[in-house]
Amino acid sequence: MPRETSLVTIIGEDSYKKLRSSRCLLVGAGGIGSELLKDIILMEFGEIHIVDLDTIDLSNLNRQFLFRQKDIKQPKSTTAVKAVQHFNNSKLVPYQGNVMDISTFPLHWFEQFDIIFNALDNLAARRYVNKISQFLSLPLIESGTAGFDGYMQPIIPGKTECFECTKKETPKTFPVCTIRSTPSQPIHCIVWAKNFLFNQLFASETSGNEDDNNQDWGTDDAEEIKRIKQETNELYELQKIIISRDASRIPEILNKLFIQDINKLLAIENLWKTRTKPVPLSDSQINTPTKTAQSASNSVGTIQEQISNFINITQKLMDRYPKEQNHIEFDKDDADTLEFVATAANIRSHIFNIPMKSVFDIKQIAGNIIPAIATTNAIVAGASSLISLRVLNLLKYAPTTKYTDLNMAFTAKASNLSQNRYLSNPKLAPPNKNCPVCSKVCRGVIKLSSDCLNKMKLSDFVVLIREKYSYPQDISLLDASNQRLLFDYDFEDLNDRTLSEINLGNGSIILFSDEEGDTMIRKAIELFLDVDDELPCNTCSLPDVEVPLIKANNSPSKNEEEEKNEKGADVVATTNSHGKDGIVILDDDEGEITIDAEPINGSKKRPVDTEISEAPSNKRTKLVNEPTNSDIVELD
């Protein structure tokens, strides 16, 4: 019986044909992504594109079932595709890259997909994909897990809540989804030091018989087995140094971790196209440590002091190791284990140009790290794949007549809705009318040819937009990426410059606002500039978007007043430029900022709606000096 027989029975022949012709994007091939890839392959999606920036690490293997020890340091996306080939019946296209990289993944690249699955572990990328979904009206299945908690949320642009419709509180825990090959924050280095390095040296079982013929190496290929044994021996070699209690060999650990391994990462050129390269330690730093006194827990010290502390504390733990039956557990209240994690994390931070932290700060962070759970990933991925059939309206017995009839899913603890069952599945809510992403502005995509970008003057561009959407004479135009004022009725300095000369380009987002009306105004529109070299010359195609007249709201609503009193700020600001590496985890501070809504310099113009403005600077930041390419900022 063909594999698809049961699926055809459930969804019908016509829906099965639609499914086979569907093209989906899976962003993330880690914990949830591995499970999702397996699920959507078995569901017979016709074409699946997989994007992931990361490479495989040892810590991934306990829950990311598509990967084996032989795959360590290999790209997740391409390795996952190879791992599923034996049961695959879909066209699979892997990419190793940052989904927020506009040069690799321009907006028109996303247009080919029927649905997007998010399996990400970082907030900036989630927000970015959510905005792409809103600009292109593409359905998005958002998901996430943290330990035993998880959730899944279908997002239908314009019909249901988007990712930004609900506030994202700063998490009190730090989910361990991967151990980064490209750390960008102190937390990444602390996770590496605590969950990988410390466990490998002091808490893992000693090596068994590495030549055991019954050992499952994940392959029958003799060369591959040889390579796996080599990798395994390298890891066990560090532990052998600990077992030997030979303090003179501690510099070998430093050399392996902070010189050899860093050089291996540097050899993977794709990792460093958009980020600063790490700088490994030097032999002289390792071999000439300074003698330092015990430093205070609230001080950081120099990198040389960190190296000396690492050597000293490793020697202490070496002496403890046999006394504790060759197994030491990390405990944040154990001064020795905490000191080891702190020094290792700080050395790694220094190498990756990340600020070092005091032992006191690291104790607070390391004590809150929770592990990822494979079962939670599988449950959330299963719910995501099943709901996609309803999002695409492929179930005849449960047709989707109204998108708010679709369900999201939360674990009981995460949802606070019911403790009587593991999963709660409330129906989707309509968009939050105060959401700055999906409700406060209209959205669209401007298709531009490269020559048009270089020839069209700003004044002509403004006229084109004003006439297309029936805006009055008094308008303002902002570069929403960094809140630069480009044009308004008393600022026309840039009118004779071309779009490229004022640093507008592929991926730029502009905000066009009505500044004239007192009672009724034209709703603001946010436009994404999609520059495509394959478009005909002089192409500047504006989207067919209905921009309605709305009531001017110059005074804060009741909800806004309550929020202001509660939070002490006019608006929760979101960052509009991602970090150089595009890797951000859920412990990012959601900064708050108060924006002065009073007219500036005596102007009688209506102030910019602070909920539309998503960057921590006022709209009247004027570009007066000659523009430079460095001013171009990608969308968060």
From Swiss-Prot:
Amino acids binding Zn(2+): C162, C165, C435, C438
Molecular function GO labels: ATP binding; metal ion binding; SUMO activating enzyme activity
Keyword hit for Iron: no
Pfam name, any one: ThiF
Location, primary (coarse class): nucleus
Compositionally biased region (Polar residues): 626-636
UniProt entry keywords in alphabetical sequence: ATP-binding, Ligase, Metal-binding, Nucleotide-binding, Nucleus, Ubl conjugation, Ubl conjugation pathway, Zinc
UniProt-listed InterPro entries: ThiF/MoeB/HesA, ThiF_NAD_FAD-bd, Ub-E1_IAD_1, Ub_act_enz_dom_a_sf, Uba2, UBA_E1_SCCH, Ubiquitin-activating_enz, UBQ-activ_enz_E1_Cys_AS
Cellular component terms per the entry's GO annotation: cytoplasm; nucleus; SUMO activating enzyme complex
Biological pathway: Protein modification; protein sumoylation
Biased composition (Acidic residues): 586-595
Sites where the protein binds ATP: 28-33, 52, 60-63, 76, 121-126
Top-level taxon of origin: Eukaryota
Residues of the active site: C177 (glycyl thioester intermediate)
SUPFAM superfamilies for the chain: Activating enzymes of the ubiquitin-like proteins (SSF69572)
UniProt region (Disordered), positions on chain: 581-636
Subcellular location: Nucleus
Gene3D superfamilies: Ubiquitin activating enzymes (Uba3). Chain: B, domain 2 (1.10.10.520), Ubiquitin-activating enzyme E1, inactive adenylation domain, subdomain 1 (3.50.50.80), Ubiquitin-like 2 activating enzyme e1b. Chain: B, domain 3 (3.10.290.20)
GO biological process, one term: protein sumoylation
Record-linked PANTHER family: SUMO-ACTIVATING ENZYME SUBUNIT 2, UBIQUITIN-ACTIVATING ENZYME E1
Something else known: Present with 18800 molecules/cell in log phase SD medium.
The protein's role, per its UniProt record: The dimeric enzyme acts as a SMT3 E1 ligase. It mediates ATP-dependent activation of SMT3 and formation of a thioester with a conserved cysteine residue on AOS1.
Protein family per UniProt: Belongs to the ubiquitin-activating E1 family.
Protein's recorded name: Ubiquitin-activating enzyme E1-like
Annotated organism of origin: Saccharomyces cerevisiae (strain ATCC 204508 / S288c)
Gene transcribed to yield this protein: UBA2
